[in-house]
Amino acid sequence: MSQKQMKEAFVSNQNGTSVLEITEGLCLPALCILCRGLLIILSQQLCSSLHNSRTRFLVDFAFLIVPLVTTLTIFSSFVLLEYLVAIILGAGLLYEIYCRRTCYARMPFQKICEKFLKVSLESEHIPAISCFRVVNSAFTAVAILAVDFPLFPRRYAKTELYGTGAMDYGVGGFIFGSAMVSPEVRRKYTKGSRFCYLTKSLYSLWPLVFLGVGRLVAIKSVDYQEHLTEYGVHWNFFFTLIAVKLITSLLLLICPLNRSWVVAISIAALYQLALDFTPLKSLILYGTDGSGTRVGLLNANREGIISVLGYVAVHMAGVQTGLYVLKKRSHIKDWIKVACCILLTAIGLFISLYIVQVNVEVASRRMANLAFCIWIVASCLILLSSLLLGDIILSFAKFVIKEAAVPCSWKLIQSPTANKKHLESIVFDAKRKEPTLCLITAMNRNQLLFFLLSNVTTGLVNLSIDTLHSSTPWALCLLNLYMFTNCLIIYVLHLQDKTIKFW
């Protein structure tokens, strides 16, 4: 067996893990980001050592990237222990900040909370959405290289037919995150005719076409290992993004934007009916001749082409979520309601997932069936609600510390009925320049470039190193170095105020 065949076999025929285990791992970054914000606030009270570019990068890397690497590798069986450490650290930092509060020092906790609920937020940008997209990007970047090493648990790898693996979440999470900030949600193409809107949508696809074709040519030219049942012979992630964007652009021309959830449910349900009552499922699994043929364009790429329908449903659900979250709100209490509503919706979807998996069909990444779509949306909503709740706690910490500033977090604007002296301090915080020393902002700014860098460096590592026989310490060092390099490049570009766009 050749090295290529060994690597392909190493990532194939996996059955995944439980939905609960994946959900546990997904919510941990929200806690880590909260701890990072609390540490920055406390450091502003104690010293200024965290306010230079090098130190801030290391802090962000330690709180955002390192926990992801360890959760997907050596601490995969100790996620609850990581939660315990993060909760203790976060609670300790919050308690210390509260004890050192410079505002409302003599006021009881209940009164402080009452005043906090009256605070307004400068909500032009929602930090939780930026963090959501960055967490998904970082998770994907770690996983695509880690999966080739023995220290990566096989249960986290992409499943072969049925089941839920941590890596199965990646594409769906990316599509959902992109949908939340799509031009339609941001009303970017509101001016002009429908034809103008469609033209702009099509024009925005050419970088993805370039990347998709480029990846296909590169993979075939170097004879790189491939997981055939993931997308097919020629298809890849970029082609899925193109197809989803094309279909959803047409759908949003026909259907009202605020009824995207109806479209999402309809597509997912009809697609599942087609899988159950037509030869569509047999076509995906066994090809047109029933023997797994890869002859012809459809047979060669049947998984990638047909699963697009499921991802379209996920995208439409993301559009509806984006419309809800990006709706203008002024008070912190409104955002508490939003976070709770999203959390309850996620719980409802997880209950629906259980019912569907028991009575209809188990989740399948390969087909992107109804259960898979529900799982992706529920997982995205649980992560988003965790990040929103973390932002609210961080806002409380900023509320009690005069002139506290944390990059990629809400700016506070006090309500007119509040204490005048504290009003001045919070308005100053709202008007001061946002610190640029932030890895999260940097990754969100050049997300596509970060993903491209991760793919290229993953290929270089695989071509130059025998990943299958790498020891755990060596693999862990390589993974952290790989992520450190990619993050540093993106961070330096951000410090130089450069956004790399191909369109």
From Swiss-Prot:
GO CC annotation, single: endoplasmic reticulum membrane
Principal subcellular localization: endoplasmic reticulum
Glycosylated sites: N15
Modification sites for Phosphoserine: S415
Residues in compartment: Cytoplasmic: 43-56, 99-131, 182-201, 258-259, 326-337, 391-447, 494-503
EC number(s) on file: 2.3.-.-
Any GO BP annotation: GPI anchor biosynthetic process
Pathway participation: Glycolipid biosynthesis; glycosylphosphatidylinositol-anchor biosynthesis
Domain of life, per lineage: Eukaryota
Transmembrane region(s): 22-42, 57-75, 79-98, 132-152, 161-181, 202-222, 237-257, 260-280, 305-325, 338-358, 370-390, 448-468, 473-493
GO terms, molecular function: glucosaminyl-phosphatidylinositol O-acyltransferase activity
Keyword rRNA-binding: no
Membrane side Lumenal: residue ranges: 1-21, 76-78, 153-160, 223-236, 281-304, 359-369, 469-472
Entry-linked InterPro entries: PIGW/GWT1
Function: Acyltransferase that catalyzes the acyl transfer from an acyl-CoA at the 2-OH position of the inositol ring of glucosaminyl phosphatidylinositol (GlcN-PI) to generate glucosaminyl acyl phosphatidylinositol (GlcN-(acyl)PI) and participates in the fourth step of GPI-anchor biosynthesis. Required for the transport of GPI-anchored proteins to the plasma membrane. Acetylation during GPI-anchor biosynthesis is not essential for the subsequent mannosylation and is usually removed soon after the attachment of GPIs to proteins.
Matching PANTHER family: PHOSPHATIDYLINOSITOL-GLYCAN BIOSYNTHESIS CLASS W PROTEIN
Protein family: Belongs to the PIGW family.
Protein name as annotated: Glucosaminyl-phosphatidylinositol-acyltransferase PIGW
Species this chain originates from: Bos taurus (Bovine)
Protein's gene: PIGW
